[in-house]
């Protein structure tokens, strides 16, 4: 309140000064006799004597008239009033308009020198002008200013002011503004994805693993599933019956040299089998169950050649060429055949070689190729060339039927472990991405290690150096098989296996480097059998 009284005095002083200057300019421009802002002052006025403005006689004067001067407000703060004007404007906006920012106000007030809150005597002309101007401004804002002034006068008379109080208030306002700005900066730096990682970076990782959970027997799981009675079985049968109305359309597309691909939620094995039996009963049918985990391209091509009543060749590439030459022959004895693939996106079929072989068979005009998919991203399996070879017409065949046969071989978590492990899938993925010479080096190492395992009793995979091969001897044997040209090339090819922990090395007592594959015997046999298809 004391600060408001000080601001009020400065505000009235500024208003009186501006009013007198405006009247003076108006008088000089129009040379009016009615203006009362010019007073005849004697050349030697008496100091300390205050004359009544009502007794003064106005006269028309010019700036050149000697002995006459313009009455100016005198006071301690007459010379520099720019900071005071800004301070008065800020306080008026704070109390009257209510649109003042605290941060801006505190910083602006800091630019103004701290004034004492003790009452200072006003200029005589200012005091008279203040009394004469009373009651002119009757707006609501003016009324609020007068009320504040009266309250401030009472507070000034009862409480002595001290300069330290004002300094303390200014310091508090400055600290409040700085704290608000610092809080805003802290909030701005904590937004976005950085805050997420900062928040969860200190969380501890649990030491629990899935291997600690009890394993459910596979047969118990199957028996429990059979006992479950689905309430939507009737609706499922209705949906299958509705889908069967499209059998004629699908058969028409097959006759016009298009292949069929069915997608949608639910098992489609029995549904597609019924379609083939009803619409294509006169044609030989070859079925591939892609959900079987141990399915290999060599086994599929060998069975397909036996289906065609032809003796299979030795290698996979020869069997594929042999199959294509038979089904594309004009004198093909069987005429048309049906090639049905359940789950063409199965784990065993997603290999690029497998998909290329199936696409080559599907491109034959003597083959009615029908397949089903269950993965939502099945389209990523094929590039433009394979997609053109398949020549699929896709249909939604949602049945909501239970995946009974498809999940029988699945290695589900918490259920009886299947023979195929994730390690086998990872190793196969790495091998398929390597050149032929690198795969030949790995196959040569597998053959040597399996031979040593046959002679070793109670072999432990953690002691693989016992069945490993010495580095220098292994390099010479690979060079004899033309798998590498020099030792740097041989070392660079082994680097890929070292990076994926497929091959490990260790130095023995004689400081010789030993190489071996740190996996169980059954896994090595599966890998070797799969690699023998390339022979």
UniProtKB/Swiss-Prot annotation:
Residues 156-165 have a biased composition (Polar residues). The modification Phosphothreonine is found at residues 44, 57, 62, 65. One of its GO terms (cellular component) is nuclear origin of replication recognition complex. Residues 166-175 have a biased composition (Basic and acidic residues). GO terms for molecular function: DNA replication origin binding. One of its GO terms (biological process) is DNA replication initiation. Changing residue 57 to A: Loss of phosphorylation by cdc2 and enhanced rereplication induced by overexpression of a cdc18 mutant lacking four cdc2 phosphorylation sites. It is found in: Nucleus; Chromosome. This is Origin recognition complex subunit 2. It comes from Schizosaccharomyces pombe (strain 972 / ATCC 24843). The lineage of its organism: Eukaryota, Fungi, Dikarya, Ascomycota, Taphrinomycotina. The gene is orc2.
């Amino acid at each position: 309140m004391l600060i408001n009284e000080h601001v009020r005095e400065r505000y009235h002083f500024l208003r009186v000064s501006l009013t007198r200057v405006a009247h003076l300019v108006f008088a000089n421009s129009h040379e009016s006799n009615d203006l009362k802002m010019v007073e005849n002052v004697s050349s030697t006025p008496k100091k300390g004597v205050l004359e009544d403005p009502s007794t003064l006689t106005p006269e028309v004067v010019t700036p050149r008239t000697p002995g006459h001067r313009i009455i100016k407000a005198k006071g301690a703060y007459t010379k520099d009033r720019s900071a005071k004007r800004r301070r008065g404007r800020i306080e008026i906006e704070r109390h009257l308009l209510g649109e003042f920012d605290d941060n801006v106000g505190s910083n602006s007030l800091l630019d103004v020198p701290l004034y004492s809150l003790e009452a200072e005597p006003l200029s005589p002309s200012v005091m008279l002008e203040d009394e004469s101007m009373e009651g002119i401004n009757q707006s609501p804002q003016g009324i609020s200013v007068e009320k504040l002034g009266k309250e401030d006068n009472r507070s000034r008379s009862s409480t002595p002011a001290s300069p330290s109080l004002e300094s303390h208030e200014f310091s508090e306002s400055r600290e409040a503004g700085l704290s608000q700005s610092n809080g805003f900066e802290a909030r701005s730096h904590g937004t976005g994805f950085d805050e997420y990682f900062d928040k969860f970076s200190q969380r501890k990782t649990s030491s629990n693993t899935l291997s600690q959970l009890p394993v459910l027997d596979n047969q118990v799981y199957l028996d429990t599933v059979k006992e479950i009675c689905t309430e939507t079985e009737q609706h499922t049968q209705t949906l299958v019956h509705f889908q069967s109305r499209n059998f004629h359309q699908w058969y028409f597309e097959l006759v016009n040299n298009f292949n069929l691909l069915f997608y949608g939620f639910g098992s489609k094995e029995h549904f597609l089998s019924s379609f083939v039996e009803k619409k294509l009963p006169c044609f030989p049918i070859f079925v591939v169950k892609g959900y079987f985990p141990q399915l290999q391209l060599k086994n599929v091509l060998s069975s397909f050649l036996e289906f065609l009543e032809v003796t299979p060749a030795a290698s996979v590439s020869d069997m594929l060429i042999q199959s294509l030459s038979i089904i594309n022959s004009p004198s093909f004895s069987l005429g048309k055949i049906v090639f049905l693939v359940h789950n063409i996106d199965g784990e065993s079929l997603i290999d690029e070689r497998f998909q290329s072989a199936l696409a080559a068979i599907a491109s034959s005009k003597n083959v009615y190729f029908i397949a089903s998919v269950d993965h939502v991203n099945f389209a990523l399996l094929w590039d433009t060339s394979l997609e053109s070879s398949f020549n699929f017409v896709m249909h939604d065949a949602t049945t909501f039927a239970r995946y009974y046969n498809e999940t029988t071989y699945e290695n589900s978590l918490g259920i009886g472990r299947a023979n195929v492990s994730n390690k086998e899938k990872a190793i196969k993925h790495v091998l398929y991405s390597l050149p032929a010479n690198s795969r030949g080096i790995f196959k040569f190492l597998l053959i040597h290690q399996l031979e040593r395992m046959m002679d070793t009793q109670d072999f432990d995979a953690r002691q693989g150096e016992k069945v490993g091969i010495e580095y220098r001897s292994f390099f010479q044997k690979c060079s004899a098989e033309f798998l590498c040209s020099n030792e740097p090339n041989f070392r660079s090819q082994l680097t890929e296996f070292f990076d994926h922990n497929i091959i490990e090395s260790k130095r023995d007592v004689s400081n010789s480097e030993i190489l071996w594959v740190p996996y169980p015997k059954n896994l090595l046999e599966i890998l070797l059998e799969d690699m023998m298809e390339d022979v």
